[in-house]
């Protein structure tokens, strides 16, 4: 297992990127948050990671410094699905508010040709407090951290 930090900054950083990271196990990757914009694509490339390999993505909460990079990931995934250049499926996990916002934003900024792949090949999975699933062959448990700023989830991965 390898942890790749893509960013460590808060919402208003200008000299680094917002907090997000990737957990890798051989050729399988689990991306957590996307930072605040399309710089996520640069951060992945600079870390030697291909955005196409991010097949499991978890978004912790709705703040723009965690969410907007995911819209760019969705755009890249969906555009390339539409062009026949992205094989297989991908999954984005988040609590109900995160998934709703991502779907609404995508519906406003992406084309119908791209949107047709949502829930067909790009799965938008709502997770609940205490819910378990398998990611990269590992048991993952999602939990509400009870943040007072915004509903926010974390996770525990059994190694």
Feature names for model-found ranges:
Residues 1-159:
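Binuclear metal-dependent hydrolase catalytic cores
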């Amino acid at each position: 297992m390898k942890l790749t930090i893509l960013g460590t900054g808060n919402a208003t950083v200008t000299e680094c990127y917002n907090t997000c990271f990737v957990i890798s196990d051989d050729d399988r990757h689990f991306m957590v948050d996307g930072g605040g914009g399309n710089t996520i694509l640069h951060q992945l490339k600079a870390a030697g990671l291909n955005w196409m390999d991010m097949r499991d993505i978890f978004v912790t909460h709705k703040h723009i410094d965690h969410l907007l990079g995911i819209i760019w990931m969705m755009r890249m995934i969906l555009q390339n699905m539409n062009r026949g250049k992205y094989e297989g499926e991908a999954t984005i996990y988040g609590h109900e508010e995160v998934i709703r916002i991502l779907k609404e934003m995508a519906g406003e900024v992406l084309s119908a040709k791209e949107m047709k792949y949502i829930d067909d090949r790009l799965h938008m999975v709502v997770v609940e407090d205490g819910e378990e699933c398998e990611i990269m062959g590992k048991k993952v448990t999602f939990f509400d951290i009870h943040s007072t700023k915004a509903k926010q989830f974390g996770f525990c991965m059994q190694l």
